[in-house]
Regions:
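Short, low-structural-confidence N-terminal segments
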Residues: 1-77, 185-228
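Solvent-exposed, amphipathic alpha-helical "stalk/arm" or coiled-coil-like segments used as scaffolds
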Residues: 74-97, 127-217
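N-terminal targeting/tethering segments
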Residues: 32-142
Length: 228
C-alpha cells in the first residue's frame, strides 16, 4: 500500500512542484511563488528527453532559479539541476516499469491531505503569500497536478524498494543508471541554452538579500529554521 507521508508544507509545495529544491523563507514566500510561477505557469516546452520522458524548459529554468535564490552560484545550480532531472526521470521510468501508477482517487486523497496540512501549518501565512506570488491557489494546483502525479508514482516506487535499500541509495543508483543512458554533453548544452535565455533574471536573483531559509530532506518530516 502507498505510504502517505506528512511532508512539511513548504517543502512539499516546492519539491512537488518538480523543481527538486527545498527552499522557503528567503526574501519572501511571495517572491518564491513568483519565481516558480514565472516558469511553470507557461505552456510546457519540451527541450530534451531522458529515456523517453520529456524534460521541459520550464522545469530546468525554475530549478536553476530557485537554487540561485537559495544562494547557490549559477554554475552549481545547473549541475545540481542536471543531476536532479536525470535522477527524477529515471525513477519515473522505473516506477512505470514496476506498475507504480497513481489513480485519480489517490491523487485527490493526497491533494486533500496536503491542502489540510498547509492550512494548519504554522507558516500558513507564508503559504498564502506563496500562492499569491504564484497567481492564486487554484492556479498552483492546476499547473502542478501533472508533476505531482509523476512525483507520487516515484514516491510509490521508492517506498516499495526501501526494505532493501535506503532512499539515498535508490536515488544514487537511479542517477548512475540514468547518466549512462544520457548524452550528458548534449543535455548540458540544452541546460546552458535555456538558462542563457534567463541570464539577466538569474543575475537579479544573485543580488538579492535572503537571510532566512527553511531546509528539509525527503526523509524528514519537520522543517528547521536557520539563519544565513
Amino acid at each position: 500500500s502507498f505510504k502517505w507521508r506528512a511532508a512539511a508544507a513548504v517543502l512539499a509545495m516546492l519539491v512537488l512542484a518538480g523543481v527538486g529544491v527545498s527552499v522557503g523563507g528567503g526574501t519572501s514566500f511571495f517572491r518564491l511563488g513568483t519565481i516558480v510561477s514565472r516558469f511553470t505557469g507557461k505552456a510546457a516546452k519540451v527541450v530534451y528527453r531522458i529515456q523517453g520522458i520529456p524534460v521541459t524548459q520550464q522545469e530546468i529554468q525554475a530549478g536553476v532559479a530557485l537554487r540561485v535564490e537559495n544562494g547557490e552560484t549559477v554554475k552549481t545550480a545547473k549541475k545540481e539541476v542536471i543531476k536532479d532531472i536525470i535522477t527524477k526521470k529515471t525513477l519515473y521510468v522505473l516506477a512505470k516499469k514496476n506498475g507504480c501508477t497513481v489513480s485519480d482517487q489517490e491523487y485527490d486523497d493526497y491533494a486533500k491531505l496536503l491542502k489540510t496540512q498547509m492550512n494548519k501549518a504554522e507558516n500558513r501565512k507564508g503559504i498564502r503569500d506563496f500562492y499569491a506570488g504564484f497567481g492564486g491557489e487554484s492556479a498552483y494546483w492546476k499547473n502542478m497536478e501533472p508533476v505531482i502525479r509523476q512525483n507520487l508514482a516515484v514516491r510509490k516506487y521508492i517506498d516499495s524498494q526501501t526494505g532493501t535499500q535506503t532512499e539515498e541509495e535508490i536515488k544514487q543508483e537511479a542517477y548512475e543508471s540514468g547518466a549512462k543512458q544520457t548524452d550528458l554533453d548534449a543535455f548540458e548544452q540544452v541546460v546552458e541554452d535555456v538558462c542563457e535565455e534567463i541570464g539577466d533574471y538569474l543575475k537579479t536573483l544573485q543580488k538579492s538579500d535572503a537571510s532566512v531559509y527553511y531546509f528539509a530532506s525527503s526523509d524528514k518530516e519537520r522543517v528547521t529554521e536557520s539563519g544565513g
